[in-house]
Structure formats: C-alpha cells, structure tokens
Amino acid sequence: MIFRKLRKFLKSKLARYPAAFRIYEAISWTFTRSAFSPKHFFPTMAAILFPTWIAPRARLALHYVGEGKLDRAIAIAEDVLARKPEAYLDDDTFNRLAVAYHLEGRTEDLRQLYDNTEDRRSEIARELQYDRLALRFFPRAGFSSIGPLGLLDIYLKAQILGITPPRTNVILGARKEFANPAYLRYWEKYFSLVSHPPTIALLAPLSCYLEERSNQLWCGPRGMRNVAMIGRAAQLQWEAEGRGPLLELSNEHRERGYRLLREFGVPQDAWFVGLHVREASDRLNLRNADVGTYRLAVEEIAKRGGWVLRMGDDSMRPLPPWPNMIDYVHSGKREDWMDVFLWAEGRFFIGTGSGPQMIPPTFGKPVAIANYGPIATIVCGKDDILLPKPYWSKNEGRYLSLSERMQPNYAFNESIRAFAKFDVRVVDNTPDELRELVIEMINRLEGQHAETEEERATQAQFAALAATYQFYPVKIARVFMSKYPQSSQRHMASTFQESLLQHN
C-alpha cells in the first residue's frame, strides 16, 4: 500500500518532465509487470528450483491467470495436485488453483479439487475432534465481497430449516475489511463477529478446519453441496412455508436514505430502483455488460414516473445525462448505508451476474436479472425475473437451448475465452430486451402481467430442468422465451447426469 501511494505521487510529479517520466515508466514496468518483477520472478524461480514448494507455484499460477495465460496456470495446478493430491491446501493456495480451473471451464476438475480438499479438511477436523464444537466460521478472505455476504442468507435459511446441521456461526474480520460494513451489521443479529486480530490469529488453527466457503456448504453426513443446490432447497421450502425475509431496513437508514434522495432531486412521492451493471473485469468476464445499453430501460422507468440510481464504484465510467437517472457512484455522496437503503427500499433492483444482485432478496425485494450466463449457478427467489445472455453455437448456426446449456462445457462457465474454445459466442442482451424486462417486472408488480399458455408450458419445462439439475426455477423473462424459443427438448448425456447425481 505504501509503495502504491509512493508510485502514484511520483507519477503525478514526473508527468511534467517527459524524459524523466519515460524512465520512470520503464523502471515501473520492469519491476511490476515484466518477467523480472518480484511477483513474477521469484515464484518462477521457486517453481523451477523447488517444484514441491506449493505456495509460490500457486501464486505464479494466479499471475498467469491475470495475464490470460490459462494454459500455463492449468499446467501448474495439475502438477501441484499430482505431486501432493492428499495435501491440505490452505485457502490462498486453493483459491489460486480454483480460479484457473474455473476460468478454463474445467468444471469436473474444479469439483474434484473441492471434494478432495473438503474431504481432507473434514478428516482432520474429526481427528482433532473440532467437529464436536458445533462451530462454523466465515472468514474475511472468503466473504468480504458483497456477493458472498449476500449468500449468508442461504447459509442461515438452510440451518433454520434443518438442511444443514445446527452451528454457532462466527464471522472473522473487522467490519472495515468487508465490502459493506453497514450491510454486515444487519447480519450481526444472527452471526457473531470476531474482529480483534490477535483473537482471529489465535483461532486460526481451529477455524481453518471449520471454515465455510462461499460456493460450497457443509451438510453434515451428506458432505459438501454446491451453494446453488442448497439455495434451491432452502428457498423453495422457505417460500412454501410462507416465511418472510431475514433482514429489515432500520428506521434510521430509511429516514437518512429518503433525505438523501430529496437532495438528489427525487420527488417525495416518486418510486425508484437501483441499477448495477458489472464492467471492466477480465476475470469471469462473461458477467460483464455495457451500461450504455440500459438507456431504453431507464427511459421506460422514467416514463412511468420512476427514478434510477446507478450503483457500483467510482472506477466505472460516468454516464451521460439520462431522464430520471442519478449516477450515484459519481455523486460524491456514496455511503455504505445508502447502498443498503437502495437495495432494501427500492421498488425492485436491476442487476447482472454480480454481487449486488444477491442483496435485495435478503430484504424481500425482487430483482430483474439481466445479462446472466451460467443458469446453473443462479441463487434467487420467486419474485425475480431472469433474462439470460443467449449462447450462439457457430458450428450449428443457432442458439443453444436452455437444456443444452446444462452440459459440462457451459453449465458453470463464466469465461468468454473458455466458450470460444467450444465455438460458442455469448451474446449480450439488447437495449430492447432490457426494456422489455423492465416492463415485465413493473407489470408483474402491478398485477397486469398475464402469461400465455405457451409461456406457462415453457416455464414448466424449465422448472423440470431446474429440478433435474438442482438449481432454482427462476421465472424466465417473456422476451427471452419469445425471441429464443426453447421448444426443443434435447437431453444431456447420461454420463453428465450420473456425475451430477453422484456429486449431489
């Protein structure tokens, strides 16, 4: 952090001296991005001289992932696992190897990595009798981002419903280390927070064997289960029993939120929605979209008297003036509690396959989910609507059906690079499709949406598909069903069904 600030300071001062600035840039490139940079050079030498030294080799694999050299990253991951397949991998090492497999679309290898690691952790926990303590830890390393924080909803619902064993749930880390400290406070009603660094360090020998991951849940004798699978079971049962949301916006945040809306110019009686569009990230880039394509959707909301507040962070590109649109992330007034207010108090939320999409349902608010890729990973509820990205098969000259998207090559894949290997092009939703999604959400909320017989039949087919592959049967947007008919009932290879059922 100190060196980063120093570099930023020097860069600003040297900008007025072109010759000195070019020398600085050359030195900076050499020591930060070239093959001689410490982050690259030392792990590379360690990989050559000490091939059994796992930690630096895993760091090198992650470095290759960042450069888009996934083949090299995968080669390191496979060699590490081949040399020590029985070894317990710490979280950092595990995550570095897992990212490489995930981006390459190696779903089965990723699942095997999860299974082997969790089996080993469970074995050690039993040997040391840690499992008898009935504790469950949620470390900052795995749950600091906003999406994993939203998944606490699923973890808790599953425990309340008896799907997972009863545990005392402990979050490890200082509030300021999490993406949204104000949102974290809402969960402290149900979770204990340990924030004192020495205490966290003392707990480390215990907690490392009892930690949860943000995409796998421990279900007792049944072993590990994918969070989307547990999310389906928990949410369907929760809804069937008529239970309400776990979180409720505080009066203080509600009052402060509406006060700030007035400062933004939102009329007192106007309704509003939050909008978040993921952008500018190379990893998991299938989740990205162009916020500029949402203009027609925003105009539709404005036409109906609503306002839109664009959420995210100030690294996102600013928006031009749109009717009834507030570029909240560039307003200079962004606060963690205001983010919570927008998620919890908006009429609905417009999201993509990114973390903020997870939060409104924890307060009982619906989400219009657009530009979504791997449907098998969806975690949502009965009031949400999904507009997936279409998958175009170059070999067959047509769009893949929803059932075909459950095949191993596509089901959990979030890397456009990996799709290119299968000659499949992932297509972003069009401005017209995004507008139709918003219209459908508003009409549903106002009780003015009437499904056709064909839509009901298609939705029933999709629900059956979701039951087979154990993910939530979210409502598919009308515009997707009409524009990309899902009438063909192609089935998956029996080998994939068997492997999926064994995993379950």
Name each model-derived stretch.
Residues 26-27, 60, 97:
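Structural register within alpha-helical repeat arrays
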Residues 103, 110, 119-252, 462-504:
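Secretory-pathway glycan-assembly enzymes, especially type II membrane glycosyltransferases
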Residues 216-263, 382-504:
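Leloir-type glycosyltransferase catalytic cores
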Residues 270-271, 275-281, 291-336, 454-460:
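Catalytic donor nucleotide-activated moiety binding site of glycosyltransferases and closely related
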Residues 339-385:
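A donor-sugar binding/catalytic signature common to diverse glycosyltransferases
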